[in-house]
UniProtKB/Swiss-Prot annotation:
Pathway: Amino-acid biosynthesis; L-histidine biosynthesis; L-histidine from 5-phospho-alpha-D-ribose 1-diphosphate: step 5/9
Active site: 77, 178, 180
Protein's name in the database: Imidazole glycerol phosphate synthase subunit HisH
Subcellular location: Cytoplasm
Function of the molecule: IGPS catalyzes the conversion of PRFAR and glutamine to IGP, AICAR and glutamate. The HisH subunit catalyzes the hydrolysis of glutamine to glutamate and ammonia as part of the synthesis of IGP and AICAR. The resulting ammonia molecule is channeled to the active site of HisF.
Gene: hisH
Length: 196
């Protein structure tokens, strides 16, 4: 199986690569469209800022290319947010794969800190990504923006408000949390993605 990780100006690519290596998978980290198109699975990771990253994706033509991929694609954190229609982070149009917007957390109480950083459980598991997953397992989040619960929600969690922890539409899967940093539970999610 050929697994490709999209290389662009965003962080956490190395941690995704390490997580795949722990599962015995040698991924190709590339921005080469032909290599990405030929891969069996594509991972779209990201830690960064939406406006700058979308500008980079548009300049390289990756914005149109990612939407045309037909194999299973997994967006992680910023990767998930960029798959949405619009982000309040920089008020930027995104890829529009998921017809929903990305909003900024608005804390209502002093003890509600932004960014949402740390471990949280997820529920309403409506995707094969979560095969063998139980409600009491924790995954790791680091983000200041969220995607509201919608028809594309494959899992949800609650921090300040309920929001989408994962999305799914056709061949596109996405997690707001970092499976590559979520221990055994995250490893299982990556393994499930690779088995789709």
């Amino acid at each position: 199986m050929k697994v490709a990780v999209i290389k662009y100006n965003a962080g956490n690519i190395r941690s995704v690569d390490y997580a795949l290596k722990r599962l015995g998978v040698e991924a190709v980290i590339t921005s080469d469209k032909e290599v990405l198109k030929a891969a069996d699975k594509v991972i779209f990771p990201g830690v960064g800022e939406a406006e700058t990253t979308m500008l980079h994706l548009k300049e390289s033509g990756m914005d149109r290319f990612i939407k045309e991929l037909r194999q299973p694609v997994l967006g992680i954190c910023l990767g998930m947010q960029l798959m949405c229609r619009f982000s309040e982070e920089g008020n930027v149009d995104c890829l529009g794969i998921f017809d929903t917007d990305v909003k900024r957390f608005a804390p209502r109480k002093h003890e509600e800190k932004v960014p949402h950083m740390g471990w949280n459980t997820i529920s309403c598991l409506k995707s094969d990504l979560f095969k063998g997953f139980t409600r009491d397992e924790f995954v790791y989040f680091v983000h200041s923006y969220y995607v509201p619960v919608s028809e594309f929600t494959a899992a949800e969690t609650d921090y300040i408000r309920p929001f989408s922890a994962a999305l799914h539409k056709d061949n596109f899967y996405a997690t707001q949390f970092h499976p590559e940093k979520s221990g055994e539970a995250g490893e299982r999610i990556i393994k499930n993605f690779l088995e789709l």
